[in-house]
Amino acid sequence: PILLDGDTGYGDFNNMRRLVRKLEQRDIAGVCIEDKLFPKTNSFIQGERQELEDVQTFCGKIQAGKDAQHDDDFCIVARVEALIAGWGLDEALRRGEAYREAGADAVLIHSKQSRPDEILAFAREWANRCPLVIVPTKYYATPTEVFREHGISLVIWANHLVRASITAMQATARSIFETESLVDVEGRVATVAEIFRLQGADELLE
């Protein structure tokens, strides 16, 4: 199943309706939207200065998305940014509960702390009201078993493939620059045939 990162829903409730319909047409399993204002900024860039969406307005987006879906299994995950914005645990819980009541299939609680303390505190208070999702980009050293013990349903490893690809591309570029040759890198990179295979364009090899 594919869960799409839908940012803030790309606008108002009308945009959210259209987004859900388009995703269902492409067999996407669900979408995660966050309660920040459109257009959004990455949560780790001055997160405490970012404004959050009005709760009722965001609930309206969730309801619009649920009303628009035709597939009963399509999921809307509501991402709570209150901890990122420095608004505290109580506000995060208030928002999470409002989003659950509005029809969210799961709630994602996000944090920029290097320890999972505030996430685990949220999980304890949340008490399995609905599935809970996390993104441990900053508190990556926490064992997955800790998340299981606190009733967390889904862990998203959000950006590590992108970051790994950057490291690999930098190393490849450095090698080519320093050796003025492809000999040292050819065995460490994907073949052209593999690229065609991933694109579903194997006929280009004929």
Regions found by a protein language model. Give the residues of each.
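Active-site loops and adjacent core secondary-structure elements that bind or stabilize anionic groups
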Residues: 156
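Alpha/beta enzyme core
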Residues: 1-153, 164-170, 174, 204
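Extended, intrinsically disordered, low-complexity segments
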Residues: 160-206
